Each structure stands twice: as C-alpha cells, then as structure tokens.
C-alpha cells in the first residue's frame, strides 16, 4: 500500500544519494488508488529497500513543448505565498547532465519551507549535507536505456531532458499556480516516465530501484494513479495487455502521439463495471459532451476491435427536445463489448434533464449496467423549483455466483426540503444481503432517518438490524431491533428505544428474547442534525451543466401545457 501511495505522489530516497533519470520506456498506469489514501501522508517505509525511509516529494514532469506558461523561463511563478522547492534549471540534451536546485530540510515538514510533505531528509552518499532551508546543487544523471531512439517522436526531435518541479500545495489544488484552474490531484500531472534510483548510502544495505509510472499529458491532469513497483531493468518492462474493447496502441513509445491524434475521432469508452457504494456521481465524473449536429461514424482499430458513435436530436409536443449521443464498441471476437448513451431533455414547462447510461460485458462473461440522471422541474404541489438526482448500478459475474444492485436518489427543493436514500442488494455464492436507508429534512427542523439491513444463507440462517429516529426542535425518539433466525428454527431478538424530552432527560428502554430488560430515565444531552450537510444550495452549485440546458424558443402566443409536461413515451 505504501508503494501505491508513493506511486501517486512521487518520492525521493532519504537514506542515500538519489538521482532522477528520464526513461520513457517505463510506463505503467493504474486506477485503483483511492484519493483518501493520498492525504496527510508524509513518511513511509519501503519494504525490500534495506530499511531506508522514503519521503514524499511532489513531482511534475513536462516535455519542453508542453510546459505551461507559468513554468517557463526556468522559474515557477508562485502565488499565494507558495514556494518553489525544486525546479528545472536546465534544458540540456540527454547526453549531458541536467541540474536541479533541491531544497533539503530536516527530518519533518517545516513551516519555514512552507512545503508540507515535500521534504528530503538525511545525507547523500557524496557527503553533501545541507541545513534546513538551504539549497544544494545535485546532478540528474542520464539513464542507460534513455537514448534518442527510445523516446517518443516528439521528444526525439527536441532531445530535451524535460523538467521536474516540486512545489508546496494548499488544499490539494494548483489554483494558485495555474491561474483559476483547480486540479484536485496535482500529483497526476506527469508527462514522461522518470526512474528514481536509490544508490548505496550510509543507511541503505544495498541499492534499490523503483519505477515511476508514466501518464499522458492531454491538456489536463492524467486520470488514474501512477503505480510504483520494484524494477529490475527499465528495458525489461513489457506493456500490460488491455482486457477491454478500447482501441489499442501499437507500441508503448508511440502511445503519446497516438492519443493526441485519435482522441477526437474515437469515443472514449467506459468499458469497466461500476464500483459499489460510490453513490451518485457528479456531472464532472460523467463528462457528458453532446454534439450540436447529427453525426454517424464508425471505425475499425488496428487490433480488429470496432467502434461507433451517433448523435441526433428528437422533437415533440410542448417544446420537447432531446439531444442525444450513442456510442459503443467491441473487440475482434465479440467477447468484450461496451455501450454508452448521453442525453439532455427540455420542454416549455421548464423541465430539464441530463442523463447517461452505460452497459458492457467482458471475455469472462461478467456483465454490468449503470444509469444516471439529474432533473430540474417544478414541484406539482408547491410549484417550487426542484432538483432530483438518481443512479442505478448492477453487475453480475459470468459464473452467476456473484452479483449486486444499487439504487440511489437525492431530492431537493428551494425551501430547504430534501430527501436521500438507497436500496442495495448483493449475493456471493450461497449468501445474500440487503440494505435500505433513507433520510428526510423538511427544511423547518424536522428530521427522519432510518436504516434496515438483513442477510440470509441458502441453509435458512437469517440475521438483521434496523433502527429509526425522528426529531423536531430537540424532541424526538429513537428505536431499533437486532434479530437472528437459525437454520434450526431458533429465534432471538433485542428491541430498544429512546425518548428525548428536550429538557436533558432521556427515557431508555428495551428487552430481548433471552430475558434482558431495562427501563430508566437518565440525564443525557440530545444531539441530532437538523439540517442536511448537502442541501439545495449545494445541489444548484453542482448542477451547472443541467441548469445550462437551453430549451427551444417558444413562439409568441403559444403557452406550455402544464398538464401535459413530459409524457411517458418521451421520458
């Protein structure tokens, strides 16, 4: 796990003289690392590296022709009092050593440097020792496998060693460094691969070598975590086979130019199943981008896989309009397939809808399906504006022994009322489980929350737990039950309850089938959340694409049929 986290952040070996060498031949991309594992991690111990300690150093690698304007002229133009701790100071060719200014600090992140987690600790093998905040000049040596023939075509023309920039960050964004653009994960800005090679030092029992994976610069952050793994030799790394119907690349070194030329003509597939317990995705996660004209295109990739994409517009009564895009693809033998659809709907009543649906299967027979929707409409009873979000997801293994289904929904209106909930089901071999939960806020202080979970086996054993709470102005109740049924017919249950009077007194009671019982009044404070942590204002702020949908212009003298709205056929 430590190596996975370090692979996303970049690192230096603190126990020995470390050098950074560009090596475009070493490329790996992984998307399994959770963002929550990247936070507040400053120190790790790398297994198999002689017990040396590794410190996190945020690294950005750019090719000469793709360096953003704010990074040019050998200096990082920082704002908001952020400091440059490591910046490229040379554009020499690969045949000569480039140089970096590296800030070496003491053993913990220091407020004097302003760089949280981007620190170097200890002495280098060459005996160079610098105090806290001082800078020392260290060379970047050329790696033996990084000849001009092993570089992508664009870099062969320039023979440039690229640039490396280490910076401090605040709130995990680059907004102060790249103008108004906010990047939630700045560590993913990596163009070319770099190998971090730990030489033998005073605190190393032997040399260790690790590979920093390479992503592709697409004018934005690279998606997916950059994986670090033990490495024997960079030239011994082989590209991993793709299991999807996504168009494949000829060679690893040609990957960057191909992505730049094919990205606009081949649809980017979502050929992986959805993940469980991830709730309702945001507009940004789906990346819906509809075309204004009717199109129909298809193609065959070099590996024999095929793809297609169609776009169009449907019109109906009452100003109904639906703009849509459908795309898909499959591999050469048809064992792997994916489909995806995007749409936006509107009419003269003010109804707006943004949605997406995807499905697929792989060579192992696994299948999946997912749909997502955002809706803006007028409430039928209160005439208030209302935003609704929903998602449904399901996946099933090819063997039929495992599968799951989830339904999520959120509803908000302009007066603070909101409702959220989910239904979940899963099965693995002979065991199945269910979960339902919901919460409702009336916008005036009343709250209802509930949860119901249960599971069972094919042998007849069942167990579960449920609870409910209702509160308003500090007064309310809580009650619940835990139960178990055995395969032999034995039953056990425990029920409990609480009455909160709003004056600091709470009545607690309960009993069980095994003879337990209690009934008492205690002095205890009452806590409950009267307002949702995510409400109407948040829903509006995160629904920019939905709100920007433009309806058809209504002719003069024509008024919307409010009773008709959107009929079932149109929906």
From Swiss-Prot:
Region (Disordered): 142-162, 215-254
Low complexity compositional bias, start-end: 145-155
Name of the protein this chain belongs to: Protein EARLY STARVATION 1, chloroplastic
GO cellular component, one term: chloroplast stroma
Record has Transit peptide as a keyword: yes
Record bears the keyword Hydrolase: no
PANTHER family: INACTIVE PURPLE ACID PHOSPHATASE-LIKE PROTEIN, PROTEIN EARLY STARVATION 1, CHLOROPLASTIC
Similarity comment: family membership: Belongs to the ESV1 family.
First-listed, main subcellular location of the protein, grouped into a coarse class: plastid
UniProt function note: Binds preferentially to highly ordered alpha-glucans, such as starch and crystalline maltodextrins. Involved in the organization of the starch granule matrix, thus influencing starch turnover by modulating the accessibility of starch polymers to modifying and degrading enzymes. Required for the control of starch degradation in leaves and starch distribution in nonphotosynthetic parts. Promotes gravitropic responses, negative in shoots but positive in roots, by facilitating starch granules (statoliths) formation in hypocotyls and roots columella.
Location(s), subcellular: Plastid, Chloroplast stroma
InterPro entries: Alpha-glucan_binding_chloro
GO biological process terms on file: negative gravitropism; regulation of starch metabolic process; starch granule initiation; starch metabolic process
Keyword set, alphabetical order: Chloroplast, Plastid, Transit peptide
């Amino acid at each position: 796990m430590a190596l996975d986290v370090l692979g996303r952040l970049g690192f230096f070996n603190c126990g020995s003289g470390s050098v950074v060498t560009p090596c475009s031949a070493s490329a790996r991309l992984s998307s399994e690392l959770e963002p929550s594992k990247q936070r507040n991690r400053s120190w790790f111990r790398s297994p198999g590296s002689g017990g040396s300690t590794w410190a996190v150093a945020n690294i950005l690698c750019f090719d000469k022709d793709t360096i953003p304007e704010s990074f040019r002229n050998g200096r990082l133009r920082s704002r908001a009092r952020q400091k440059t701790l490591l910046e490229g100071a040379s554009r020499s060719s690969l045949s000569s050593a480039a140089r970096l200014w590296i800030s070496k600090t003491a053993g913990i992140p220091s407020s004097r440097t302003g760089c949280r987690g981007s620190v170097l600790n200890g002495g280098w093998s060459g005996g160079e020792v610098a105090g806290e905040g001082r800078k020392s000049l260290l060379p970047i040596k050329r790696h033996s496998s990084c000849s001009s023939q092993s570089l992508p075509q664009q870099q062969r023309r320039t023979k440039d060693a690229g640039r490396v920039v280490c910076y401090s960050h605040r709130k995990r964004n680059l907004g102060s460094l790249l103008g108004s653009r906010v990047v939630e994960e700045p560590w993913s800005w990596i163009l070319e691969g770099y190998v971090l090679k730990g030489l033998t030092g005073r605190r190393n029992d032997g040399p260790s070598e690790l590979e920093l994976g390479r992503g592709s610069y697409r004018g934005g952050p690279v998606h997916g975590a950059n994986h670090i793994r033990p490495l024997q030799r960079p030239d011994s790394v082989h590209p991993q086979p793709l299991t999807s119907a996504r168009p494949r690349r000829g060679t690893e070194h040609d990957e960057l130019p191909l992505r730049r030329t094919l990205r606009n003509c081949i649809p980017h597939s979502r050929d992986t199943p959805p993940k469980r317990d991830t709730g309702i995705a945001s507009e940004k996660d789906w990346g819906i981008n509809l075309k204004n004209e009717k199109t129909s295109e298809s193609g065959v990739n070099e590996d024999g896989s095929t793809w297609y994409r169609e776009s169009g517009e449907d019109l109906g009564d009452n100003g109904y309009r639906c703009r849509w895009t459908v795309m898909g693809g499959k591999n050469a033998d048809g064992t792997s397939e994916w489909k995806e659809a995007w749409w936006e709907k509107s009419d003269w009543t003010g109804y707006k809808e943004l949605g997406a649906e995807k499905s697929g299967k792989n060579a192992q027979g696994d299948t999946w399906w997912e749909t997502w929707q955002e809706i803006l409409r007028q409430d039928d009873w209160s005439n208030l504006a209302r935003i609704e979000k929903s998602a449904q997801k399901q996946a099933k293994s090819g063997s039929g022994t495992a599968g799951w289904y989830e339904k999520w929904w959120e509803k908000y209106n302009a007066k603070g009322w909101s409702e959220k909930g989910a239904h979940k089901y899963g099965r693995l071999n002979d065991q199945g489980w269910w979960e339902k939960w919901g919460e409702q806020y009336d916008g005036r202080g009343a709250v209802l929350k509930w949860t119901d979970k249960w599971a069972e086996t094919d042998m007849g054993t069942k167990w579960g737990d449920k609870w409910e709470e209702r509160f308003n102005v500090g007064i309310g109740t809580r009650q619940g039950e835990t139960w178990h049924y055995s395969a032999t017919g034995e039953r056990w249950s425990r029920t409990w309850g609480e009455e909160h009077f709003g004056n600091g007194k709470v009545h607690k009671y309960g009993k069980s089938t095994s003879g337990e019982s209690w009934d008492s009044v205690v002095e205890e404070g009452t806590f409950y959340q009267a307002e949702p942590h995510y409400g109407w204002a948040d829903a509006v702020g995160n629904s920019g694409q939905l709100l920007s949908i433009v309806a058809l212009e209504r002719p003069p003298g024509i008024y919307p049929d409010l009773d008709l709205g959107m009929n079932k056929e149109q929906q």
